[in-house]
Amino acid sequence: MAKKSMIARDVKRKKLVKKYAAKRKSLLDEFNAAKDPMERLEIHRKIQALPRNSAPNRVRNRCWATGKPRGVYRDFGLCRNQLRQRAHNGELPGVVKSSW
């Protein structure tokens, strides 16, 4: 189980990403469309003025059951240990153990 403070920090980051997503997207579109270097610099400063934790790449993909940050399968949102355990218990519909 991950530390509660780390899980809370990640939840806070997800909220910030959602809050600033539209503003960040519009600024990035302006930045990519701008041709003048001074205009690009000004837009870049506006992007830098946004909270650092509002960038989507700062959000860590975590297991929703344990909060572990590593070995997380995107399709399920579970870490490998929980995925194996729940698949064996039949709690994941459509997941079967492979054999050939």
UniProtKB/Swiss-Prot annotation:
InterPro entries linked to this entry: Ribosomal_uS14 (IPR001209), Ribosomal_uS14_bac/plastid (IPR023036), Ribosomal_uS14_CS (IPR018271)
Sample GO molecular function, one term: rRNA binding
One Pfam assignment: Ribosomal_S14
Superkingdom in the source lineage: Bacteria
GO process annotations (BP): translation
Gene Ontology cellular component terms for the protein in this record: cytoplasm; small ribosomal subunit
Key words, A-Z: Ribonucleoprotein, Ribosomal protein, RNA-binding, rRNA-binding
The UniProt record lists the keyword RNA-binding: yes
Family, as annotated: Belongs to the universal ribosomal protein uS14 family.
Function (record text): Binds 16S rRNA, required for the assembly of 30S particles and may also be responsible for determining the conformation of the 16S rRNA at the A site.
Quaternary structure note: Part of the 30S ribosomal subunit. Contacts proteins S3 and S10.
Protein name: Small ribosomal subunit protein uS14
